[in-house]
């Protein structure tokens, strides 16, 4: 019994320390703001026809908001740290410069930014390059895209696809069709349908599958036998699936609406009920999935989830109660870590992971602008006073090298630009032009 004589005292100390820590966290989360509690809209833009300008609501001047968006675009597409590179008279690509490749992720993000900001030449250049150098024109993968390429040698780093690339390309092209029509040099709708139609004839033959797992009505990690039976939560964009039901016009409207509903319910399961965090990869049940290259945790892919949920709220607001609750949990957790100091990788319970996923040759935790940005976008669903502080944090953030020299104008930069678009009301559903 001698070894246990100190246990009561130890318990007292642990309880006292735990209570002290909880009290500190509670104090950290009691953030007040003169602007009061945020009040999210009750209807999405699909019905309301309008988009919130959160920056304006936060007290920033419209001229400054316009300048902020213009500078963010310039930094990512035109400045000395740009990731957009023109090739000849009619093509361009977006490069993950820190990893020396071009990806369907970045190319399709660039196209989305271009169609949102009405930059047709940029959109067309990116599409031509993607179609020429990444899209498979024949064989089992016909219509799909190689997800990574060396832009200097034009050699594919992989022939396989990442399902989010096709997801964005299709949505980009449908939006372009709605905005610019199909008679200005590129038949955007036909290009979107080519990908969609190619997707639906892939039945697993030669190992190539649909982008969707048809049984689960969920997007796959990769449309092949390797990734067909699991997923990436950041690929679950119910807002996009809703729009496919409206604009793809391929007779599968109900399937896409079912996928949107399923994606929302999937996110309920994938996101931790206290921290709001999700794993980069999961089973279709939402259970975290480890892979041979890394254990399950909230890492870089997961940064996109708050922004995706905010988009769904802004556009459709079909899952308001849960999405507001999600924003509260996530922002409570991050503010508890310090709005200006929270790290960029976590275990789902909020503890720091033992394994740190490196980026661009750097293997360390940092306060990354990409997560600062997407955490701020969650304020679209915010109901607390502290949600304003996340908006302010994004407003004050700078897309520039960190003190150790690390700089990511690609992933950090694109998420930064996307989030500024969301919070300024410039990331919108593009409906077809109607003639009077």
Question: What are these model-derived regions, one by one?
Answer:
Residues 1-27:
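Bacterial Sec-dependent N-terminal signal peptides
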Residues 30-71, 100-104, 139-144, 158-164, ...:
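Extended ligand-binding clefts on enzyme/binding-domain cores
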Residues 54, 58-106, 114-136, 140-158:
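Internal amphipathic alpha-helical repeat/solenoid segments
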Residues 100-110, 156-180:
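Aromatic-rich carbohydrate-recognition surfaces in CAZymes
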Residues 110, 122-123, 185, 192, ...:
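Solenoid-repeat scaffolds in large eukaryotic assemblies
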Residues 111-118, 168-179, 239-246, 307-314, ...:
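Short glycine/serine- and small hydrophobic-enriched flexible loop segments
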Residues 127, 173, 189, 196, ...:
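Inward-facing hydrophobic residues that define packing positions of alpha-helical scaffold repeats
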Residues 352-436:
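C-terminal functional modules
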């Amino acid at each position: 019994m001698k070894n246990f004589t100190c246990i009561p005292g130890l318990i007292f100390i642990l309880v006292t320390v735990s209570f002290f820590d909880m009290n500190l966290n509670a104090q950290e989360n009691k953030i007040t703001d003169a602007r009061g509690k945020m009040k999210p809209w009750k209807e999405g833009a699909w019905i309301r026809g309008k988009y919130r300008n959160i920056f304006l609501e936060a007290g920033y001047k419209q001229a400054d908001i316009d300048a902020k968006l213009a500078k963010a675009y310039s930094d990512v597409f035109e400045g000395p740290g740009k990731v957009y590179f023109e090739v000849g008279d009619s093509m361009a690509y977006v490069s993950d410069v820190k990893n020396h490749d071009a990806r369907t992720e970045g190319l399709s993000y660039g196209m989305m930014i271009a169609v949102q900001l009405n930059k047709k030449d940029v959109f067309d250049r990116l599409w031509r390059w993607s179609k020429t150098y990444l899209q498979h024109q024949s064989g089992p993968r016909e219509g799909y895209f190689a997800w990574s390429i060396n832009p200097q040698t034009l050699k594919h780093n992989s022939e396989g696809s990442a399902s989010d690339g096709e997801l964005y390309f299709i949505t980009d092209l449908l939006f372009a069709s709605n905005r610019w029509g199909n008679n200005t040099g590129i038949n955007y709708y036909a290009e979107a349908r080519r990908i969609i139609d190619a997707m639906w004839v892939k039945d697993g033959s030669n190992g190539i599958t649909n982008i969707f797992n048809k049984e689960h009505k969920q997007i796959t990690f990769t449309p092949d036998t390797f990734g067909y039976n699991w997923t990436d939560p950041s690929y679950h964009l119910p807002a996009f699936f809703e729009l496919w039901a409206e604009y793809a016009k391929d007779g599968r409207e109900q399937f896409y609406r079912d996928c949107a509903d399923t994606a929302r319910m999937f996110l309920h399961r994938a996101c931790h009920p206290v921290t709001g965090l999700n794993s980069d990869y999961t089973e279709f049940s939402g259970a975290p999935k480890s892979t041979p290259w890394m254990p399950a945790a909230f890492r870089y892919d997961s940064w996109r989830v708050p922004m995706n949920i905010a988009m769904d709220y802004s556009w459709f607001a079909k899952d308001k109660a849960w999405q507001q609750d999600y924003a509260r949990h996530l922002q409570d957790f991050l503010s508890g870590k310090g709005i200006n100091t929270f790290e960029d990788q976590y275990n789902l319970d909020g503890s720091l992971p033992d394994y740190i996923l490196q980026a661009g040759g750097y293997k360390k935790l940092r306060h990354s602008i990409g997560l600062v940005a997407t955490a701020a976008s969650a304020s679209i669903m915010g109901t607390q006073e502290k949600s304003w502080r996340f908006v302010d944090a994004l407003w004050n953030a700078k897309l520039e090298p960190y003190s150790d020299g690390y700089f990511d104008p690609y992933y950090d930069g694109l998420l930064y630009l996307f989030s500024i678009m969301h919070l300024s009301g410039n990331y919108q559903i593009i409906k077809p032009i109607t003639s009077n």
